[in-house]
C-alpha cells in the first residue's frame, strides 16, 4: 500500500462515520464544510472568533481531504531539500514530536519522504500531540496498513497547549530528534499568550542537536511569533525562506479519484514560510 492508498483508507473510514440520511446528503455536508474551513482560515487573525474546533467528523474529513494531502507533500519537500534532516531520518532510530499534528500532515510527510528516498531498516516513532482526541483514530492503523521496509510507530497523545496540567507530565517527547510544526502556530495565534508557555517549554527543554521544522502561512503574525520564540530560546537557524510551495498531484488523482470527483481538487499551492532550526 502506498501513501495515497493509505490516505484513501483513512478518508473511507472518516467518510463512514459521518451521519446523514443519504450519500448525497453526506456529500453536501462535506462540501459545505470545505467552504466553511476556507472561510475560517481567512480569519485566523480575528481574535473575536475562537480557534477552529475539529470535534465534528465532517470537519475532520474536510480537512484531511482538502489540506492534509498538500501539507504532507510540503513536509516531504522540505526534508528532501535539507541534508541534516535527510541524515536524521536515515538513522536506525529517530523520534519525532508532531506538535498540533492531529491532522496527519507531519506524519504523512515524513513517511512520504522515507518511501520516496527508499529508506530501509530504520525505525521512526512519531509522537502526535493534539487537543482533539478523535484525530488519533485516523492514524492508529498506519503501522499495520503501510507496507514499508522501515518501521513506523505513531503514538497519539492528547494535550491542550493552553493548559499546563495536560502537558507538563509528558517528558519522553522532549528527547525527540525532530519537532514539527505544520500550520499549527496560525491555528493558535489567537491564543498566543496562553500558548507561549508550552512552546517555551518545548524549545528550552529540547536536547542539544535536535531540530525543529516549522512551516505555515506566509504571514508576518505567524512567522514573527515563531522567530520570537526561536530567538528567546537560542535556536540556531539552519535554513529559512518565504516561497510558494506546490505539489504534483498525478499520484493523488489516481488513488483519490473518487473523492476528487465528489469534492474537487485538494489544495495544490501555498504562499508559505518555513524555518529549519537547531538546538545548539
Task: Report the location of each language-model feature.
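Conserved SAM-binding loop of SAM-dependent methyltransferases across substrates and taxa
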Residues: 103-120
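S-adenosyl-L-methionine
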Residues: 134-173
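A short glycine-rich, Lys/Arg-flanked "PGG" loop and its adjoining helix->strand segment in the class I
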Residues: 193-208
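Class I S-adenosyl-L-methionine
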Residues: 222-280
Amino acid at each position: 500500500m502506498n501513501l495515497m492508498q493509505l490516505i484513501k483508507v483513512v478518508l473511507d473510514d472518516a467518510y463512514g462515520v459521518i451521519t446523514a440520511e443519504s450519500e448525497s446528503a453526506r456529500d453536501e455536508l462535506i462540501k459545505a464544510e470545505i467552504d466553511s474551513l476556507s472561510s475560517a482560515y481567512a480569519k485566523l487573525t480575528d481574535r473575536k472568533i475562537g480557534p477552529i474546533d475539529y470535534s465534528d467528523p465532517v470537519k475532520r474529513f474536510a480537512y484531511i481531504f482538502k489540506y492534509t494531502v498538500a501539507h504532507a507533500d510540503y513536509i516531504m519537500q522540505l526534508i528532501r531539500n535539507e541534508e541534516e534532516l535527510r541524515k536524521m531520518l536515515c538513522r536506525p532510530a529517530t523520534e519525532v514530536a508532531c506538535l498540533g499534528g492531529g491532522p496527519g500532515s507531519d506524519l504523512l510527510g515524513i513517511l512520504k519522504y522515507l518511501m520516496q528516498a527508499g529508506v530501509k531498516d530504520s525505525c521512526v516513532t512519531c509522537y502526535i500531540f493534539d487537543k482533539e482526541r478523535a484525530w488519533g483514530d485516523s492514524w492508529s492503523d498506519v503501522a499495520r496498513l503501510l507496507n514499508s521496509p522501515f518501521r513506523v510507530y505513531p503514538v497519539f497523545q492528547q494535550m491542550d497547549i493552553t493548559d499546563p496540567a495536560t502537558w507538563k507530565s509528558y517528558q519522553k517527547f522532549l528527547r525527540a530528534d525532530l519537532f514539527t510544526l505544520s500550520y499549527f502556530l496560525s491555528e493558535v495565534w489567537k491564543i498566543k499568550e496562553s500558548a507561549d508557555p508550552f512552546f517555551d517549554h518545548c524549545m528550552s527543554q529540547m536536547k542539544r542537536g535536535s531540530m525543529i521544522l516549522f512551516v505555515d502561512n506566509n504571514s508576518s503574525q505567524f512567522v514573527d511569533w515563531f522567530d520570537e520564540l526561536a530567538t528567546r530560546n537560542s535556536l540556531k537557524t539552519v535554513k529559512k525562506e518565504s516561497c510558494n510551495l506546490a505539489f504534483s498531484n498525478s499520484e493523488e488523482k489516481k488513488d483519490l479519484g473518487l473523492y476528487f470527483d465528489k469534492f474537487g481538487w485538494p489544495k495544490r499551492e501555498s504562499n508559505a514560510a518555513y524555518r529549519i532550526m537547531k538546538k545548539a
